[in-house]
Structure formats: C-alpha cells, structure tokens
C-alpha cells in the first residue's frame, strides 16, 4: 500500500530514507511498487503539468506565403520566466529562417499561446505578436537555409531539433522568409515550457 506524505512531514527525522517526488498536485509521494518514480523527459513532464505551450502559424495551400514575404512572430516572456523553446519551420520551397533577440516591434496582431495539455487551464506568461512592424531586428542568434529543390518536384523541408532557453523581458523575433520566387505553403511552430 503506497504512503502519501504531506509537506508538513518533510522536517520529521526518520531512520529510513526513501526516494520521493512532488506530483502535479504538489503532493510529496514516496516511491513504491505501486507509485514508481516518474522517468519521463522534462518536456513530457511539463506537458502533463500544464506548463507546455505552443503557437502555430500556417499559410496553407489555399493562402500560400508569397515570394519574398515573411512570417514574423515576436515573443517575450514575463519577469523570471526562462522559457525552454523548440522551433519547427517548414515550407514548400527555398526559405530562410532567422531568430533575433532584442528586437523592437510595434503593431501586429496579438495572438494567444495555447496550452499543449488541452485539459489544463494554465496560461503562458508570454506576449506574442504576429507580423508586427519591425523597427529594429536586434541581434541575430540563429540563421538557417531551408532548401526547396528545383523543377516540378521541388519541395521544402525543415524539422531540425534545435532548442533554446529564452531570457525574460526580451523580445525575440522568429522570421521565416520565402526566397523561392513563387508562393508556397509554409508554417512556423514554436513550442516551449515555462
């Protein structure tokens, strides 16, 4: 039979030391055969805790990203929030992807971050603007070329596994630009936990 330990007992001296963990309800739980130590990766754990978020912008086949056009997503996090972020970008043709920090932006469309745990009511401590006016790009932190190929069988790509830890109170600009010469489907997905 598992034993659940309340927080008040953490200061009690005991002869036995048993591993324990704090669950999503902030209850200290002793490890046992019925309650094994969770061993999921941190991203998976944050997802179940309701601390994983995402933002996605898609230019579908019916409304392709024009040649020379960009998807600009500006994001900043509240004081004390060091978001661990992963980006995923894909496009149907040649494209360039950049990340800038210390960007200065105005206007744009305020968009919500969505919780990746659809059962959680937790909200992100972020502010996101889609396609704002960029007055200062800031410092380039990352740059990547997404090759699309040539001819009728050309196709873009993406899907790296780069991850970043973002500083609080700093505006970051994520820019995906279609450099193919023709309109193409494109998307940018930002996922993070706080």
Task: Give names to the regions the model predicted.
Residues 1-121, 126-139, 144-145, 177-187, ...:
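Extended, low-complexity segments enriched in Ser/Thr/Gly and acidic residues that occur primarily
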Residues 145-169:
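Beta-sandwich interaction modules
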